[in-house]
Amino acid sequence: MTSIVLTPWWRHRRPASARAGEAPGSAVPTAILDWRHERVQELLADARSAASGTGERSLLLAAHRLISERVRAVYALDDAQSASRTLARRRGSCSQRLAVLEAVARAAGIPTRVRGLLVDGSFWYPRFPRLRHLVPDTVVLAWPEFRLGEEWVGVSELYAPLGSLGEANPAGFTNTGSQTLFEALASTAVDWDGSTCGADGCSSFDLSAVVRRDLGRFSSRDELFAAHGQTLCRPARIAGGALLGRRSAA
């Protein structure tokens, strides 16, 4: 059983229109992706120094690794928190850390956009086995995409194609233990579309069953949350953040 009491249940989160799929993306700063801030600029400089190559993908991989090392995974609830604030706190949720990665990308001139997914709350049951009744009915997930060359690359395939990641780690992502969605990107296939399913069935890393709705693509996560709201209503975010904001995701 999941809860809708703490969510903005009055919002009608409808599937994306055909036009929503045309989101052009951007590299401009936003309230969340405040890449002009000195903390984001410092992370960009460090990522450039740590990158194994000179390409844009190498830069993003280095930034991802640095964020994993420097920003502790916690159950923070404010998806609209700026990237610079997350860096200052040195802790953040998967959503907040993905926003930091996006901010670094934009700071480097790499356009980004997000795909909005409405994910079933049961996906997070393994994290909160004794608090299932408080887990939101659905979670609004902003899943980044990066413009690398002439194509958009989803964050799920930043390290390698889903097939290659699946072969390397057939167990898939279980949403348990210390590996969060953010860390999983480096070694595990995260398949929201069921694209890895074949004639003989679906793989263990197919997560399409927990996707309630595809909200479409937006030029920024700011636009997604403005259109569909965050997972929890403001009072719930404040109360929940005070209780869970420092709790490690493990």
Where are these regions (language model features)?
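Residue-level signal for well-ordered alpha-helical scaffold segments within enzymatic catalytic domains
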Residues: 65-66, 103, 107, 146
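Active-site neighborhood of thiol-dependent amide/isopeptide-bond enzymes
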Residues: 77-135, 139
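His-Asp-centered catalytic microenvironments across diverse enzyme cores
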Residues: 2-10, 15-24, 32, 119-250
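Generic hydrophobic/packing signal
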Residues: 44, 60, 96-98, 102, ...
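Secondary-structure boundary elements
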Residues: 3-89
